[in-house]
Amino acid sequence: MSVSEIFVELQGFLAAEQDIREEIRKVVQSLEQTAREILTLLQGVHQGTGFQDIPKRCLKAREHFGTVKTHLTSLKTKFPAEQYYRFHEHWRFVLQRLVFLAAFVVYLETETLVTREAVTEILGIEPDREKGFHLDVEDYLSGVLILASELSRLSVNSVTAGDYSRPLHISTFINELDSGFRLLNLKNDSLRKRYDGLKYDVKKVEEVVYDLSIRGFNKETAAACGEK
C-alpha cells in the first residue's frame, strides 16, 4: 500500500467517526432542549404559589422524561456499545443535568434521595456498564451535588413563601448527603470541585434554619436547633 493510499484509508476512518459524532450531537441537542423544559417547569416551585403546584409539576416533569427516554434510545443506536467512553464527553453534562432533574422530582415527591437504579429507570438506560449505555457512577454523584445546590436555594425561597418547616427537612437531608459524600474517596477532579461546594450549601441551609429558630417562626425548627 502506498503512502497516499494509507492516508486515504485513514481519512475514511476519520470521516466515519466525524459522522458518528455529528449524529450524537444532534440527539444531545434534543436532550438539552428537553432538559431545559423540565428545568423551567420545576423552577416554578421557587415562586410564591409554586409549593401548591408541586404534585402537578412533578407529574408533568415525569411526562417529559418520556421524551428523554425516546432521545436516549435513539442515542444508543448512534455508536457501538463498547465505545461508550470514547464518546461519553458529548452527553456527560446533559446526563448529569438529567440526573439532577430526576433527583429533584423524587425529592419533591418523597423528600428522599433517588437511587442510581431508580434514575436509570426514569431515563430508560442501564445501571451497569456491562449492559451497554449506562449511568456512570460519577455522573450520578454530580447530579446529586447539583440537587444539593438547588435545595439550598429552595430553603431560602420556602421562607419567603411562608413554609417554615421545609428548610428544616432540607437541612436534615443535605447534612445526610454531606455525611454520605464524606465516605467516598473522590478521585475525579471535577467531582471533587463540585463536592467542595456542598459545604457552602450545608452552611446556607443551616443559616436559614438558625434564623427561623431565632425569630421563633417554627416550633419544630426551634426545638431541633435547641437539641444541637
Swiss-Prot record:
Lineage: Eukaryota, Metazoa, Chordata, Craniata, Vertebrata
Family from the record: Belongs to the translin family.
Highest taxon above the source species: Eukaryota
Enzyme kind, highest EC tier: hydrolase
Positions where N6-acetyllysine occurs in the chain: 187, 199
Gene Ontology CC entries for this record: endoplasmic reticulum; endoribonuclease complex; male germ cell nucleus; nucleoplasm
Region of interest: DNA/RNA binding: 86-90
GO BP term, example: siRNA processing
GO MF entries: endonuclease activity; identical protein binding; mRNA binding; sequence-specific DNA binding; single-stranded DNA binding
Modification Phosphoserine occurs at: 190
InterPro entries: Translin, Translin_C, Translin_fam, Translin_N, Translin_sf
Job description of the protein: DNA-binding protein that specifically recognizes consensus sequences at the breakpoint junctions in chromosomal translocations, mostly involving immunoglobulin (Ig)/T-cell receptor gene segments. Seems to recognize single-stranded DNA ends generated by staggered breaks occurring at recombination hot spots. Exhibits both single-stranded and double-stranded endoribonuclease activity. May act as an activator of RNA-induced silencing complex (RISC) by facilitating endonucleolytic cleavage of the siRNA passenger strand.
Keywords: Acetylation, Cytoplasm, DNA-binding, Endonuclease, Hydrolase, Nuclease, Nucleus, Phosphoprotein, RNA-binding
SUPFAM superfamilies per record: Translin
Complex formation: Ring-shaped heterooctamer of six TSN and two TSNAX subunits, DNA/RNA binding occurs inside the ring.
UniProt xrefs under CDD domains: Translin
EC number(s) given by UniProt: 3.1.-.-
Residue ranges of the region described as Leucine-zipper: 177-198
Subcellular location: Cytoplasm; Nucleus
Main localization category: cytoplasm
UniProt name for this protein: Translin
Pfam families the UniProt entry points to: Translin
